């Protein structure tokens, strides 16, 4: 993890979790993470695997140009990336495994032309963390999508669909100290022949 939002949210999640596989949704005190909420979201794990947003931070609403709450999380991503995102969400829930990733956003082309702004890419760090909900383990997921830097179009025009850059499960050493160690666990997404490969196994487990 590189972004302070990711690090702070993970540390808070870890304190709530204690010896459990994941903390409960009701354990979260918004006041304790008020400085993070603009970049945070909560996803419901539904039977249809649409993954509706149950909480969506104000900066994410600004990114997408409207209220994100209730919208399917997968709709925020390019068609080509949705299978990987869905598999990552299920891996987090089924394996109680935190996942960190990178994404990229551009201003929507038509809107950027009308508003006379650039389409310069804005880079994000994605963090996905498992939650329990009223004791159920396959119910909710806590996440953050935090931007690196600023671009002139942000908040003025909506972003196009997010582009997934990378996904990986957090290593044991990284979970202990946020040291950035990556060798203990294989990445979820690998670059081979110019593309990512993500294989989904029964029960939502995923391997590269």
Range-by-range predicted roles:
Residues 2-165:
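Sensory/regulatory domains in signal-transduction proteins
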Residues 167-206:
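Short hydrophobic short-linear motifs embedded
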């Amino acid at each position: 993890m590189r972004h302070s939002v990711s690090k702070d949210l993970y540390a808070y999640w870890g304190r709530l979790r204690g010896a459990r596989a994941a903390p409960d949704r009701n354990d979260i005190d918004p006041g304790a993470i008020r400085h993070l909420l603009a970049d945070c979201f909560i996803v419901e794990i539904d039977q249809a695997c649409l993954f509706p947003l149950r909480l969506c931070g104000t900066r994410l609403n600004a990114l997408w140009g409207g209220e994100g709450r209730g919208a399917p999380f997968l709709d925020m991503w390019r068609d080509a990336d949705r299978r990987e995102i869905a598999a990552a969400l299920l891996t987090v829930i089924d394996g109680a495994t935190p996942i960190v990733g990178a994404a990229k956003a551009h201003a929507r082309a038509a809107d950027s032309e009308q508003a006379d702004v650039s389409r310069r890419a804005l880079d994000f760090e994605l963090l996905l963390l498992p939650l329990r909900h009223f004791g159920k383990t396959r119910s909710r997921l806590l996440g953050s999508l935090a931007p690196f830097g600023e671009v002139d179009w942000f908040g003025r025009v909506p972003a196009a669909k997010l582009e997934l850059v990378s996904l990986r499960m957090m290593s044991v050493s990284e979970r202990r100290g946020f040291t950035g160690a990556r060798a203990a666990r294989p990445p979820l997404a690998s670059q081979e022949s110019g593309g990512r490969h993500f294989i989904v196994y029964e029960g939502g487990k995923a391997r590269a």
